[in-house]
Structure formats: structure tokens, C-alpha cells
């Protein structure tokens, strides 16, 4: 691992990364519990579940898992190709809009509707989000796949023990916070499914609205403080 320069940890980017990993865990738990044991973010899990199902002759939800995997891949591919035209490079927050709108719609779709019409579109939106957001404070991370983040955590802590450079310690702590955020999203979603069942997904647009409003208020507060200091 290369030697990292000391970085000033951006509170804004860290909050956003924590929020995105929380949402990824939240949506994954929802689709796994409510929508046919399928994951929209953890595609490795889908491959394992699909393979085991095929061996055990349990192919009832195989099509949904295959379409979920393909949809996620298409989301990543399309955003990579068109992100500059869609202004996602300058405003990656725009990639959250499809997920928010779709979650709002799915919250009112009954469980009798086939999951192949529900989970793949969510996976497509998750592909957009995980492609648009790829770093926090200049450190690459993934808001959907925790295996890579776990590896980066241990690499960072290992490098800190070896070199005693504080930058590695800070990086390791960032990844720990991301892992905890993902777990909290899973736990929170799993608990809410007991109460709200399929409507649990409505928590996504609600949380996004609150988070976006807090970002706007924080930005306005900073601008106001700058004006006061200037005067």
C-alpha cells in the first residue's frame, strides 16, 4: 500500500458516505427479507444464492436473481458512459433521484406482484449510486460491497502498525465507520420490516429528503457565517 499524505477529513463527504452505506444495507435487507431473498447491492451474495439454488433444484427465483445481477451491471455501465452528459460528475447527488422515486413507488406495490418487476429496477438504481460515489475524503471505498471495505480496513490498520503513519489510522477508522453504518442500515431495515412489511422501503426517500435538507441548511449556514465574518 502506498504512503498516504495527511488528509483533512471532509465532514460533508464522510456524512454522505455513511448515509450511502446505511442506505445500501437498508435496501439490501429489505429486498432479502421482503422481496424473495435477493440482494440489490451485494451481487456476490446473489451469485452464491443462485448457484446453491440451481444445485438444489430450487429455481423458482432464479430469473429474478439473474435479472438483478444484469440490471446492476447495466446501471454501472450506463452511468460510466453517460455520466458527463448527465452532469453526474459535478453533481453525483443526482444519481440518488431514481432510487428515491422508485422506492416511493415500490412502497405501495403489493407483495403479490412478482419480484422480477421490483428487485432488478432497484439493482439498476443501486448500480447508478455505487458508480457515482466512489470516494470519501479522497479515499476510494464502496457503498454497496462490504468485502472490499473490510479488506481496506485491515490493510490500513496493518500499514499503521507497520509504519506508524497517522494517515493509515485515519483511513482505517473511516472504513470502520462505513462498516458500522452498513450494519446499522441492515438492522434498522430488518426491524422495520416486522412492523411495516413491504412499506419499509418508503424509509429510503424519507431519509434522503431529510439528509438532503440537512445538507442544504448546512450549506446556507456556512454561507451566512462567511458573510458575517466578511462584514
Residue ranges and their predicted role:
Residues 69, 73-77, 179-187:
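Hydrophobic/small/kink-forming positions within alpha-helical transmembrane segments
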Residues 100-114, 215, 219:
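C-terminal ends and interior cores of transmembrane alpha-helices
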Residues 1-13, 226:
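Short, Lys/Arg-rich, polar N-terminal cytosolic tail immediately upstream
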Residues 76-89, 193:
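Helix-to-loop junctions at the C-terminal end of transmembrane segments
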Residues 84-98, 198-200:
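Cytoplasmic membrane-interface "Motif A"-like loop-to-helix N-cap segments
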Residues 13, 17-60, 129-170:
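Small-residue-rich hydrophobic segments that form or flank transmembrane alpha-helices
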Residues 93-106, 205:
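Structural signature of the two symmetry-related core transmembrane helices
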Amino acid at each position: 500500500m502506498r504512503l498516504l499524505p495527511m488528509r483533512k477529513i471532509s465532514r460533508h463527504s464522510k456524512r454522505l458516505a455513511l448515509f450511502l452505506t446505511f442506505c445500501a444495507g437498508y435496501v439490501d435487507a429489505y429486498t432479502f427479507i421482503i422481496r424473495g431473498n435477493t440482494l440489490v447491492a451485494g451481487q456476490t451474495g446473489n451469485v452464491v444464492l443462485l448457484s446453491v439454488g440451481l444445485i438444489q433444484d430450487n429455481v423458482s427465483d432464479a430469473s429474478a436473481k439473474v435479472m438483478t445481477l444484469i440490471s446492476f451491471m447495466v446501471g454501472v455501465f450506463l452511468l460510466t458512459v453517460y455520466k458527463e452528459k448527465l452532469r453526474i460528475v459535478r453533481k453525483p447527488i443526482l444519481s440518488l433521484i431514481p432510487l428515491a422515486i422508485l422506492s416511493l413507488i415500490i412502497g405501495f406495490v403489493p407483495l403479490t406482484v412478482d419480484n422480477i418487476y421490483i428487485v432488478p429496477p432497484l439493482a439498476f438504481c443501486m448500480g447508478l449510486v455505487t458508480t457515482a460515489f466512489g470516494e470519501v475524503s479522497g479515499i476510494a471505498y464502496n457503498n454497496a460491497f462490504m468485502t472490499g471495505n473490510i479488506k481496506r480496513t485491515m490493510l490500513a490498520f496493518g500499514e499503521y502498525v507497520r509504519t506508524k503513519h497517522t494517515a493509515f489510522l485515519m483511513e482505517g477508522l473511516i472504513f470502520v465507520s462505513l462498516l458500522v453504518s452498513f450494519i446499522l442500515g441492515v438492522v434498522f431495515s430488518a426491524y422495520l420490516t416486522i412492523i411495516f412489511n413491504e412499506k419499509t422501503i418508503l424509509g429510503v426517500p424519507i431519509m434522503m429528503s431529510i439528509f438532503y435538507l440537512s445538507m442544504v441548511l448546512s450549506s446556507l449556514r456556512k454561507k451566512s457565517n462567511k458573510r458575517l465574518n466578511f462584514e
